[in-house]
Design a protein with these regions (language model features):
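Short amphipathic alpha-helices in soluble, non-transmembrane regions
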Residues: 108, 211-220, 274-279
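Active-site region of PLP-dependent enzymes
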Residues: 60-67, 75-199, 232
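Active-site phosphate-binding strand-loop segment of PLP-dependent enzymes
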Residues: 3-91, 96-104, 259
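Active-site-adjacent capping/gating segments
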Residues: 60, 67-76, 131-138, 189, ...
Length: 281
């Protein structure tokens, strides 16, 4: 939709037109900029069309829907978080997957460490399960383990997450109040959803050229980012993805979207400078 997350109305139309044997096995709901998708409606479609839901919550740690935190998997099968260096909390690199399904949990534990199984209840060779040292590999996987050092770094920051999200929310509220709405389309606020405000994405109005605006802000010392180049525009995927014209929403969004600075220690003086510079354009 216009905010970036998956359009439920568009998805409904696509699912209705899709033949039964071609229905998707899974839908990835991307909570772009930290704003949750409409997970309740998506869950209704999941029950009707029998697909899995994977939440991409790389931006959304600390976000919530009706006071329920993203990652609780109330509407999904899996939820994925990123702990990359620029995320709300970081372990340098890495991330985590949450699920509230026991079967999925045991499968993830197996896949994260070379496919190794140590749980006696899951071992196939039962006569050896009595030995404490015994383990099995029943399928190929890789080493996806986060180190103890990285984990300790992440855990130490979780205590600060509420503060980090609070500061981002204050900055976002100030931007929403002060940036000229006649010149820019600003993010929407929803009663039942709380954004983590990983990004603050604006879209220029009145035929303001986004590239010219980007260059203007750069000259003024304000770093902005274009989020994100559609996957099918990258050379490798151009050959893989056909009928790109059907992905017009991705193209339109990318051509308009511009992320302005938002991070916990962005002080009021810098916020005012960003607002003034934008409004004077």
């Amino acid at each position: 939709n216009e905010d970036g997350p998956l359009s439920i109305d568009y998805l409904k139309k696509k699912l209705q037109k899709t033949k039964k044997n071609n229905l998707p096995k899974a839908i990835i709901a991307v909570h772009i900029a930290g704003l949750p998708c409409d997970m309740e409606e998506l869950h209704k479609l999941k029950k009707k069309y029998k697909f899995k839901i994977i939440e991409d919550a790389s931006h959304a740690l600390g976000a919530s829907i009706k006071s329920k935190k993203i990652g609780s998997c109330n509407y999904s099968d899996f939820c994925i978080f990123s702990f990359h260096a620029i995320k709300s909390i970081t372990t340098g690199e890495g991330g985590c997957i949450t699920t509230n399904n026991k079967k999925n949990y045991h499968r993830l534990c197996q896949l994260r460490s070379h496919g190794i199984i140590r749980d006696k209840n899951l071992l196939k060779t039962k006569n050896l399960s009595k030995y404490h040292w015994y383990y099995e590999v029943n399928e190929i996987s890789f080493n996806f383990r986060l180190t103890d050092f990285q984990s300790a770094l992440g855990i130490s920051q979780i205590k600060k997450l509420k503060k980090f999200i609070g500061l981002r929310t204050q900055i976002a509220s100030y931007y929403l109040k002060k940036i000229d709405k006649k010149k820019f389309i600003l993010p929407k606020i929803y009663k039942d959803k709380k954004s983590a405000w990983h990004l603050f994405i604006i879209k220029p109005k009145n035929n303001i050229n986004r590239s010219n605006l980007y260059n203007y802000l750069k000259r003024k010392g304000i770093v902005t980012v274009l989020h994100y180049i559609p996957i099918f525009k990258h050379p490798y995927y151009k050959k893989k993805i056909k009928n790109q014209e059907r992905l017009i929403n991705s193209i339109n969004y990318f051509q308009q979207a511009l992320s302005i600075p938002i991070y916990p220690n962005l002080n009021k003086k810098k916020q005012n400078y960003i607002i003034k510079t934008l409004n004077n354009y």
